[in-house]
A protein has these predicted regions:
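ATP/Mg2+-dependent ligation/transfer catalytic cores
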Residues: 1-194
Length: 194
């Protein structure tokens, strides 16, 4: 798991956008939307992004005091390196790829979750172990968009699936079932349209 795959790729002539994305230390998906031409020109060398993305809280406000990024009067760049093995067509015309953040000197950003996971997997391998993971989804989702929820002060929101209770309670409406089915397909290696 030491390296990400950067094999050749074909986006197809109908692609108008490539969304690059990765998580920060809070698990928030952050990234950019690029034209296919810009993506092709920068994917192998790294795509510059401000290290500010590691200093944003869940409300998207800059927060100071973290060990990384080390802001001392300026915001530095980090490089996004796409993992081409994660490239999928998200919907017609839009491709999405997950990647990792690296410092411009070539060192992995230690607070990047994928880099951290990679270093842990590599450390386990040196001791003769193989890492395995599992995901348990425990969440309450709401029908309102993030903008609507903020405007309401995160109060009086409508739970997706109705008010049937906990995540284990299966008496939920079809919108919950449809959503969770899509999540399970995606986690199982599928993507929209499969």
């Amino acid at each position: 798991m030491s390296e990400t795959r950067t094999a050749p790729y074909d986006l197809g002539a109908d692609t108008h956008t490539v969304r690059i994305e990765s998580t920060n230390h809070d698990g928030s998906f952050l990234g950019k939307n690029l034209t296919p031409r810009k993506f092709a020109a920068t994917a192998s060398s790294g795509i510059a992004m401000a290290d500010l993305l590691f200093g944003l809280d869940l409300g998207n406000a800059p927060t100071f005091g973290f060990a990384f990024p080390e802001w001392r009067g300026h915001v530095s760049d980090v490089e996004f390196r796409p993992d081409m093995s994660t490239l999928v067509q998200w919907k017609p015309g839009l491709h999405s790829v997950i990647g990792d953040y690296w410092q411009t000197g070539g060192e992995p950003v230690g607070t990047c979750p994928r880099n951290l996971a990679r270093s842990l997997v590599d450390r386990l391998a040196t001791r003769g172990f193989t890492a395995c993971i599992a995901v348990e989804i425990e969440a309450t989702l709401f029908e309102e968009s993030i903008h609507e929820a903020r405007a309401k002060g995160y109060r009086g929101l409508t739970p997706l699936g109705g008010s049937a209770g906990t995540a284990y309670h299966l008496a939920k409406s079809s919108d919950w079932v449809d959503y969770m089915s899509a999540v399970v397909r995606r986690l199982d290696g599928g993507h929209p349209g499969q």
